[in-house]
Amino acid sequence: MNDDWLIYRGIGEPHDGIDALPDPPPWRDFDGGPVVEPGPAAAAEGNVARRLGAHRQAAELHRPEAEELEAINAALYLRRPLLVTGFPGTGKSTLAHSVAHELKLGRVLRWPVVSRTVLQDGLYRYDALARLQDVQLASGGAGAAGGAPGTRSGAVPGIGKYIRLGPLGTALLPTARPRVLLVDELDKSDIDLPNDLLNVLEEGEFALPELERVADTEPEVEVLTDDGTKATVRGGRVRCRAFPFIILTSNGERDFPAALLRRCIQLKLGQPGEKRLATMVRAHLGEEAARLGGDLIREFLGRSQSELVAADQLLNAVYLTHYASPATREDLADLLIQRLDRPR
């Protein structure tokens, strides 16, 4: 495969390849602005060692398969979300951290999805109750935190104090470089969320009605972001400039609507092979652990042919059996590497 077009190469070593990313296709060109600087908190990668391994060496990292590289780079070029499907423990979430690390795109914004998650959770939250309490306190009203009238008076804080952008909302701020957003386990959502995402993913923007209502008097409002920093929202709308690199993960437990699928680049991950598992163990636990855990890796591979097991179970087993006596090693491995699809 000709690698000249690749922005993300899967080499594990940070570089400035993102600067060579061509302009987006006309139908995915966004003009949000003025450009927002993410700030130091967004630039800090945080838990890279925990996600990718404290013992990793660039030369030893497993190079992604050609299909993975093509899908990731297609998503980068086309400014489309990447829908990654695979069994638990196949490295779906790790892809987001790997791309952010190699392309120096800062902290991964993570949006974990559960059955009660709604679109609003990802965009922003407005704490109307806290604002009402502050208004009452500032005016010395009778309802001020249970106090008597006149207990406190003063200026009411601006509305921006009560608005915090969620992971998706923060990713859509008009930054010069794309942010990385991980929407984890989208298949756990209720039936509406995938459809609710369509317009935001297509348009790269969303409105904050609470700020639109005051835009005539407060055209610029400073709000909190998911990074814990502040950003200015203008005219009550957030519109991206560099469309974020978005990874949607799924364990394959449900089908998604065609309208979402056609807006995504799709990638299916299979179970990792022996070489990839050994590299993973080496990256997280070191060379000696990978050498001593060879039998566990082979046992794990054997089980994965007929049972649903996850790679993090293997890491747990290699780590714990390193400290256990040989007599209990096999029992611990059986305890920790249990099939995930067994009848309950």
Task: List the predicted regions and their residue ranges.
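C-terminal regulatory/interaction module of P-loop NTP-utilizing enzymes
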Residues: M1-R344
